């Protein structure tokens, strides 16, 4: 009873003091920071990224598959880059601004193969950047540990990443041939023999070799409008840089000279477009009796008469 009376006295004492002064305000205690805004830094970064598609299946050297499911980060300046091999590359601005940038720089797409060696991983179909999608190339280099060592942007919307790993230190760790199943290895062996026997041209060899890599899942099948399918892309785009266009032109010029040499060697007449009157270009062409069948350059097969 005494305790109840004491409590009642305390309550009456506070009530007697009257309301708080006009200048005072009640303080509201906030236990958690707000998470309003798409790019709020307190929001988990992965929850606000919307990829355009799923990544391609894991492929390539079997010993690299252990990198799948792992992520490696690097902070440069005010940005944090995160590489998840065989998944994607993301970029996050390290700031508390409400509109801090977070985006996808590419989703795992295919390998880059040069001289029959895995040279890099292409991450494509990232977030929109001007008139196209962001994309990244990941170069694998030998290192003491798995780590994302460097990130740069050599051209607009195209990023270059260097990933160090002890998994590629062996000189044969990135060779393509040993990773292929037996059936595709046999196709490659036959292709090499056909090239030696001059049953196919160099162009046909490269085309057939790419088909082997596509069947293995290392490269994606090229589509006519693949570049245009990227958001905001330009229709009919074939070369991303002037250097790649010049290299392709040089390779075609060399192939033309080589084929002209073969025709001359076998006595097959041919005319240069610059020396042929315009009327002959558009007029009907009547094949000459006994003339050897011309080379069929697209499939890369040579005529039997050669």
Swiss-Prot record:
Modifications the protein undergoes after translation, according to the UniProt entry: Cys-245 mediates the formation of the interchain disulfide bond for formation of the homodimer. Cys-142, Cys-157 and Cys-169 are involved in intramolecular disulfide bonds formation.
Comp. bias intervals (Basic and acidic residues): 295-306
Annotated compartments: Secreted; Golgi apparatus
One of the record's GO cellular component terms: extracellular region
SMART domains found in the cross-reference section: DMAP_binding
Span of the signal peptide: 1-24
Annotated DMAP1-binding domain residues: 176-279
InterPro entries xrefs: DMAP1-bd, Gtb1-like, Man6P_isomerase_rcpt-bd_dom_sf, MRH_dom, OS9-like_dom
Region (Disordered): 38-63, 267-306
Function: Non-catalytic subunit of the N-acetylglucosamine-1-phosphotransferase complex, an enzyme that catalyzes the formation of mannose 6-phosphate (M6P) markers on high mannose type oligosaccharides in the Golgi apparatus. Binds and presents the high mannose glycans of the acceptor to the catalytic alpha and beta subunits (GNPTAB). Enhances the rate of N-acetylglucosamine-1-phosphate transfer to the oligosaccharides of acid hydrolase acceptors.
Assembly and oligomerization: Homodimer; disulfide-linked. Hexamer of two alpha (GNPTAB), two beta (GNPTAB) and two gamma (GNPTG) subunits; disulfide-linked. The alpha and/or the beta subunits of the enzyme constitute the catalytic subunits.
Name under which the protein is recorded: N-acetylglucosamine-1-phosphotransferase subunit gamma
Species in which this protein is naturally found: Bos taurus (Bovine)
Gene: GNPTG
């Amino acid at each position: 009873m005494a305790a109840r009376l004491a409590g009642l006295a305390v309550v009456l004492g506070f009530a007697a003091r009257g309301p708080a002064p006009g200048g005072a305000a009640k303080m509201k205690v906030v236990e958690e920071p707000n998470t309003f805004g798409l790019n709020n830094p307190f929001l988990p970064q992965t929850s606000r990224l919307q990829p355009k598609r799923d990544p391609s299946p894991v492929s390539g050297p079997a010993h690299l598959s252990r990198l799948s499911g792992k992520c490696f980060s690097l902070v440069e300046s005010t940005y944090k880059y995160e590489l998840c091999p065989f998944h994607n590359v993301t970029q996050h601005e390290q700031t508390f601004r409400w509109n801090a940038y977070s985006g996808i720089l590419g989703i795992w797409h295919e390998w880059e193969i040069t001289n029959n060696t895995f040279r890099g991983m292409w991450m494509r179909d990232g977030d929109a950047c001007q008139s196209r999608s962001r994309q990244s190339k990941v170069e694998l280099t030998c290192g003491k540990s798995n780590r994302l060592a460097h990130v740069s942007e050599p051209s607009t919307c195209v990023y270059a990443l260097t990933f160090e790993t002890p998994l590629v230190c062996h000189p044969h760790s990135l060779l393509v041939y040993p990773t292929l199943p037996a059936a595709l290895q046999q196709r490659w062996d036959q292709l090499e023999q056909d090239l030696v026997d001059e049953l196919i041209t160099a162009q046909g060899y490269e085309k057939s070799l790419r088909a082997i890599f596509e069947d293995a899942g290392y490269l994606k099948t090229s589509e006519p409008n693949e570049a245009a399918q990227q958001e905001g892309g330009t229709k009919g785009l074939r070369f991303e840089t002037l250097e790649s266009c010049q290299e392709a032109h040089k390779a075609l010029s060399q192939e033309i000279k080589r084929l002209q040499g073969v025709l001359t060697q076998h006595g097959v007449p041919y005319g240069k477009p610059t020396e042929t009157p315009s009327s002959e270009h558009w007029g009907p062409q009547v094949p000459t009796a006994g003339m050897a069948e011309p080379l069929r350059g697209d499939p890369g097969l040579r005529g039997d008469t050669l």
